[in-house]
Design a protein with these regions (language model features):
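FabD-like malonyl-/acyl-CoA
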Residues: 1-144, 271-300
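Alpha/beta catalytic cores of group-transfer enzymes, especially the acyltransferase/condensing modules
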Residues: 10-11, 38, 103-252
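Soluble or luminal CAZymes and related metallo-dependent hydrolases
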Residues: 26, 252-256
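Short alpha-helix immediately C-terminal to the canonical SAM-binding loop
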Residues: 177, 282, 303-304
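Catalytic histidine-centered segment of alpha/beta-hydrolase-like enzymes
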Residues: 202, 276, 306
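Short, flexible loop segments at boundaries between secondary-structure elements
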Residues: 233, 293-308
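A short, well-structured juxtamembrane/interface segment
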Residues: 255-263
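Non-catalytic positions within long, well-ordered alpha-helices that form the structural scaffold/packing
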Residues: 265-268
Length: 308
């Protein structure tokens, strides 16, 4: 059995998706619709940059979704590979929106619009430079939670991403993260400050939660037979009525990616297909379980060799 997985931020590069755009009218139509939906040329930004503009969260989120959605539809329509046979659809952070759109719960234009709003809300939730994220390597969730508890009167930080065995990301205020990094260093735990301008997936995103609550409540989610795994619970979403609440909770809560992958494997998934730019999730899955099959779809050659 296979699962389809969709990447989040950090996978974007200028020029991504160009091969698909050049080869398939279907993709040209999707890019044109995206430009019209967003009232600016996201196509030009994706293909020409500049990189610093593509890296702005408000642009990155709809851009990565557009690439993932385009590739997904090329696989289905141009190569007649039925990805709806997937046991689960799942995505990392913004990738969860790619998953629910490709799985049939939210239409293309609504997903673009909500991700543009989400990107702006998350970027503006904390003044620039006042929050950030730190990656911790070679430790465990239990160890990090113990350190956070022991130092709760000294600094505040939250686990934002539980990505894989030995890769955890924390969010917090810049000053608190400096203190955290010193404590981690004292404990011989390797850590790296990430080049992001906001502390995603923690309580500092509260203003973004308010905006997204209002915006998500305006949307109509459809029904689908396809099963989704939630970032918030790492479990199957049993009822599509829970989608909005889980997407709202996702903004301030940790992305339980490691647990999500383990849960899918425990439910007989032995093949993961990553659809979108880069191969970040493929690397994480490999760290979690070396036995499973992984396909990363970045070009048409990858699709031609895909077997499900």
């Amino acid at each position: 059995m296979f699962s389809v997985i969709f990447p989040g931020q950090g996978s974007q590069i200028v020029g991504m998706g160009k091969e698909f755009y050049d080869k398939f009218d279907l993709v040209k139509k999707l890019f044109k619709e995206a430009d019209e939906t967003l009232n600016f040329s996201i196509s030009k930004l994706i293909f020409e940059g500049p990189k610093e503009d593509l890296d702005l969260t408000i642009n990155t989120q709809p851009a990565i979704f557009l690439i993932s959605y385009s590739i997904f539809n090329v696989i289905k329509t141009e190569f007649n590979i039925d990805l709806n046979k997937a046991k689960y659809f799942a995505g990392h952070s913004l990738g969860e929106y790619s998953a629910l759109s490709c799985a049939g719960y939210l239409n293309f234009s609504d997903t673009l619009k909500i991700l543009r709003i989400r990107g702006g809300a998350m970027q503006n939730a904390v003044p620039k430079g006042q929050g950030g994220m730190v990656a911790v390597l070679g430790s465990t969730v239990e160890t990090i939670e113990k350190i956070l508890l022991e130092n709760e009167n000294n600094f505040k930080a939250q686990i934002a991403n539980d990505n894989s065995e030995g890769q955890i990301v924390l969010s917090g205020k810049t000053d608190d993260l400096e203190k955290l990094m010193n404590v981690l260093k004292d404990n011989n735990i390797k850590n790296i400050k990430l080049p992001v301008s906001a502390p995603f997936h923690c309580s500092l995103m509260n203003n973004a939660t308010k905006i997204m609550t209002e915006e998500l409540n305006k949307l109509n989610f459809g029904n689908s037979e396809n099963k989704l795994i939630s970032n918030v619970t790492a479990e199957e979403i049993e009822n599509s009525e829970d989608l909005k609440e889980l997407l709202i909770k996702q903004i301030e809560n940790r992305v339980r990616w490691r647990e999500s992958v383990i849960n899918m494997i425990d439910n007989n998934v032995n093949h993961f297909i990553e659809i979108g730019p880069g191969k970040v999730l493929s690397g994480l899955v490999k760290r979690i379980n070396r036995e499973v099959k992984i396909d990363t779809i970045n070009n048409t050659e990858d699709i031609e060799s895909l077997k499900i």
